[in-house]
């Protein structure tokens, strides 16, 4: 293939000059003689191309030779990637030797056509009460975990991977986009301890890496997930964190000379998000169910980045700092979280009525809190006292010990089936457990455990 040379280096953006009759295409991967990979972003005319470095540009100098590979970045796909940790280029970073893949796919691929897509209303049971009841996941759907810093997005995601791998024995792909290296390390050890590592492919582009790596690592993970889907499997695709994907795009956009738009984001924000999200879909062969953690800057859900993500999701799980401050984990806000699946035609009348009953009771309690704060509980009517008592039990019963958090909580994790979840909340709403003290409901699994606990109090 054609050879060019570096003519300008501005941080992560590199300009390379090629002969005019052999200019690389946009998204072609170029190899610098030092071993660094570049990706073409713009053709500037006169044989010049502007590229993003997928690695540090330290030590580069003008005049270095650059070779065009003639293809976009290609990464290993298939079952050989399971249990391995790779970087954005699909190179192993776990010191376990080469991957030995059977095939390599381009990371830039077209989304499935309209005819190939399928829609399913089958529910995916997660074993987490609040999610299964209030914002159920669809098999092949897209889920967003929204939350500010430190409210438990990563822990929730780890629990979902563990539950689904063990209870549904499915394959998962985890893309760590611009998150802390420590979290990636914890995640790896957690998967090893839960014996599910052989069912997960891990792709990391961490916080300390150049923007090119963080921008493309989500596509690397998605390509691996697409291969499993096209083999007829139901695969889970986890992204932590989709906000960092946007942020990497913002960093690169300014260096490429584009005008910034609202709040300094790149003008192509909606398009970049769409290109990624449209590929995460289910076809007639298999399904990709995706769970995406979305960092919410300054807890502001109207920020352009989380707001753009909302449009693509089927379920939104909103993690609330107020609930976390009460010590209730998972800190999912049952009044803010939504799901397209929460429809009597999909989940059935009983599930729908119980979920709405739970939300109604909690909403009423929220309204009464001001009165309680000023006048105290004694001023409430008997009916309202009952609502408050039940709401407090529901709040506590929405908490649950996680398997992946056993180290912190000291209590064994619980997986609660959807049937048991509905039975428990239905009982609370109907007053079946009015005689049980509210502390018995805190950090419990099924309702049977609550009853057993209460008998010992």
From Swiss-Prot:
The keyword NADP is annotated on this UniProt entry: no
UniProt xrefs under SMART domains: AAA
SUPFAM superfamilies: C-terminal domain of alpha and beta subunits of F1 ATP synthase (SSF47917), N-terminal domain of alpha and beta subunits of F1 ATP synthase (SSF50615), P-loop containing nucleoside triphosphate hydrolases (SSF52540)
Binding site for ATP: 147-154
Catalytic activity: ATP + H2O + 4 H(+)(in) = ADP + phosphate + 5 H(+)(out)
Locations listed in the record: Cell inner membrane
TM annotation in the entry: none
Disulfide feature: none
Topological category with respect to the lipid bilayer: Peripheral membrane protein
EC id: 7.1.2.2
Matching InterPro entries: AAA+_ATPase, ATP-synt_VA_C, ATP_synth_F1_bsu, ATPase_a/bsu_AS, ATPase_alpha/beta_chains, ATPase_F1/V1/A1_a/bsu_N, ATPase_F1/V1/A1_a/bsu_N_sf, ATPase_F1/V1/A1_a/bsu_nucl-bd
Record key words, sorted: ATP synthesis, ATP-binding, Cell inner membrane, Cell membrane, CF(1), Hydrogen ion transport, Ion transport, Membrane, Nucleotide-binding, Translocase, Transport
Pfam families, alphabetized: ATP-synt_ab (PF00006), ATP-synt_ab_N (PF02874), ATP-synt_VA_C (PF22919)
Quaternary organization: F-type ATPases have 2 components, CF(1) - the catalytic core - and CF(0) - the membrane proton channel. CF(1) has five subunits: alpha(3), beta(3), gamma(1), delta(1), epsilon(1). CF(0) has three main subunits: a(1), b(2) and c(9-12). The alpha and beta chains form an alternating ring which encloses part of the gamma chain. CF(1) is attached to CF(0) by a central stalk formed by the gamma and epsilon chains, while a peripheral stalk is formed by the delta and b chains.
HAMAP family, per database record: ATP_synth_beta_bact
Family according to the record: Belongs to the ATPase alpha/beta chains family.
Cited function: Produces ATP from ADP in the presence of a proton gradient across the membrane. The catalytic sites are hosted primarily by the beta subunits.
Protein name: ATP synthase subunit beta
Organism: Actinobacillus pleuropneumoniae serotype 5b (strain L20)
């Amino acid at each position: 293939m054609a050879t060019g040379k570096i003519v300008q280096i501005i941080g992560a953006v590199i300009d390379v000059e090629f002969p005019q009759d052999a200019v690389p295409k946009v998204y072609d991967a170029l190899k610098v003689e030092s071993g660094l990979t570049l990706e073409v972003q713009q053709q500037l005319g006169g044989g010049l191309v502007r590229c993003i470095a997928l690695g540090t540009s330290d030590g580069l100098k003008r005049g270095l030779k650059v070779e065009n590979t003639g293809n976009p970045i290609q990464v290993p796909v298939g079952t050989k990637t399971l249990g391995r940790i790779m970087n954005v280029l699909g190179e192993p970073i776990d010191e376990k030797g080469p991957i030995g893949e059977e095939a390599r796919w381009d990371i830039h691929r077209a989304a499935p056509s309209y005819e190939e897509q399928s829609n399913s209303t089958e529910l995916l049971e997660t074993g987490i009460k609040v999610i299964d009841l209030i914002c159920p996941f669809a098999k092949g759907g897209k889920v967003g975990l929204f939350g500010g810093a430190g409210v438990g997005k990563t822990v929730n995601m780890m629990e979902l991977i563990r539950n689904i791998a063990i209870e549904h024995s499915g394959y998962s792909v985890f893309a760590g986009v611009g998150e802390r290296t420590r979290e990636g390390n914890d995640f790896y050890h957690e998967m090893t301890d839960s014996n599910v590592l052989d069912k997960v492919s891990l792709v990391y582009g961490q916080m300390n890496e150049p923007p090119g790596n963080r921008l493309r690592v989500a596509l690397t993970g998605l390509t691996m997930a697409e291969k499993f889907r096209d083999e007829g499997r139901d695969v889970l695709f986890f992204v932590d964190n989709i906000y960092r994907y946007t942020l990497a795009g913002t960093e690169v956009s300014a260096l490429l000379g584009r005008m910034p738009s609202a709040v300094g984001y790149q003008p192509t924000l909606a398009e970049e998000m769409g290109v990624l999200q449209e590929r995460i879909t289910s076809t007639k062969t298999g399904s990709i169910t995706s769970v995406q953690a979305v960092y919410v800057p300054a807890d502001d859900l109207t920020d352009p980045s989380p707001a753009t993500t909302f449009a693509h999701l089927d379920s939104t799980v909103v993690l609330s700092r107020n609930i976390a401050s009460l010590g209730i984990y998972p800190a999912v806000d049952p009044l803010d979280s939504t799901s397209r699946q929460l429809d009597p035609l999909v989940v059935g009348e009983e599930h729908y009525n119980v979920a709405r009953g739970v939300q109604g009771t909690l909403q009423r309690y929220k309204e009464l809190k001001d009165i309680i704060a000023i006048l105290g509980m004694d001023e409430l009517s008997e009916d309202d006292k009952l609502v408050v008592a039940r709401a407090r039990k529901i709040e506590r019963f929405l908490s649950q010990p996680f398997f992946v958090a056993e180290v912190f909580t000291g209590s064994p994790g619980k997986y609660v089936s959807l049937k048991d979840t509905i039975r428990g909340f239905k009982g609370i709403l109907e007053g079946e457990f009015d005689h049980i003290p509210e502390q018995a409901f805190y950090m419990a699994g099924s309702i049977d455990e609550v009853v057993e606990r209460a008998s010992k109090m």
